[in-house]
Amino acid sequence: MSNTDKERAIAAALAQIEKSYGKGSVMKLGQRPNIDIEAVSTGSLGLDMALGIGGVPKGRIIEIFGPESSGKTTLTLHLIAEAQKKGGTCAFIDAEHALDPAYAKKLGVNIDELIISQPDTGEQALEITDTLIRSGGIDMVIIDSVAALVPKSEIEGEMGDAQMASQARLMSQALRKLTASISRTNCIAVFINQIRMKIGVMFGSPETTTGGNALKFYASVRIDIRRIGSIKDKEEVIGSQTKVKVVKNKVSPPFKTADFDIMYGSGISKEGEIIDLGVKLDIVEKSGSWFSYNNVRIGQGRENVKQYLKEHPQIANEIEKIIREKSSKITNMNLDQMEEEND
């Protein structure tokens, strides 16, 4: 088979796959992201770029997972705040019964307009989710978390009763129902999930997420969020360094990464990301511990520069605008980073 015939055969196969399974189900890894898909910002400049379309896609299922206290709920609260800024209506299904309204408000969430439900069982939670999505008036629904979606049979049973795969069956059935409604209403469904360890794994990662495999298949975007370090002010811990990896992405090439700071009480540090991405793209100059922008020194030490940008929002916005214009370059840098890590 000649090269031309091969290219035609591949193009025909790709067209057939897209026709059968939808646009974005297959693409070349280095292909330009599909910019026609509507997106909602995550509140993180770096993560928006790693996702390839400027945020999470509308009309899709998103899974955010990671260890305890890694920033999963913080990230989803930022998502709600960004959706509300665009005039969207959001719902929070609090299966864990752990949402802190005061913290949500600090992150920019309009709690007066946020619809909240604290269901008793997994079936109730997913029925409420289904009803809200089918209404067509909800732009984003958060389910916190999959691990807390306990089936009714387990709640009504005795302690110690074996409920083999009942949660996995519940999730599989619910996602089959939800997928079409989510796509039709252009709603974003975000599932927060926890990590568990598989027993007896000799090779590969022993980590897995709760609720069976259905969510892994139905999710268009899966985001792995991890705490990689602490941010200290002298001896006091004031935040955590966070790394996110887009482990699945059906709307843009996957495996991109982003780093950001989560400051206790205020959420994702936009200023920290502007500094880091600005230095990567040579927009902000770094010489030793000094940082400069347009040949003017803006501070010594990263924390001091963050404070400077907070006090001078016009400079922060100016640098952010330039970073977004050069976002394609950042995408390539992330791919190069991944290649280096794999080598």
From Swiss-Prot:
GO biological process, one term: DNA repair
GO cellular component terms listed in the entry, alphabetical order: cytosol
A molecular function (GO) term: ATP binding
Listed InterPro entries: AAA+_ATPase, DNA_recomb/repair_RecA, DNA_recomb/repair_RecA_CS, P-loop_NTPase, RecA-like_C, RecA-like_N, RecA_ATP-bd, RecA_C_sf
Main location class: cytoplasm
CDD domains hit by this protein: RecA
Domain of life: Bacteria
Positions of ATP binding: 66-73
Disulfide-bonded cysteines: none
Subcellular location: Cytoplasm
Keywords, in A-Z order: ATP-binding, Cytoplasm, DNA damage, DNA recombination, DNA repair, DNA-binding, Nucleotide-binding, SOS response
Gene3D superfamilies (alphabetical): P-loop containing nucleotide triphosphate hydrolases
Annotated function: Can catalyze the hydrolysis of ATP in the presence of single-stranded DNA, the ATP-dependent uptake of single-stranded DNA by duplex DNA, and the ATP-dependent hybridization of homologous single-stranded DNAs. It interacts with LexA causing its activation and leading to its autocatalytic cleavage.
Similarity comment text for this entry: Belongs to the RecA family.
Protein's UniProt name: Protein RecA
Source organism of the structure: Rickettsia canadensis (strain McKiel)
Gene: recA
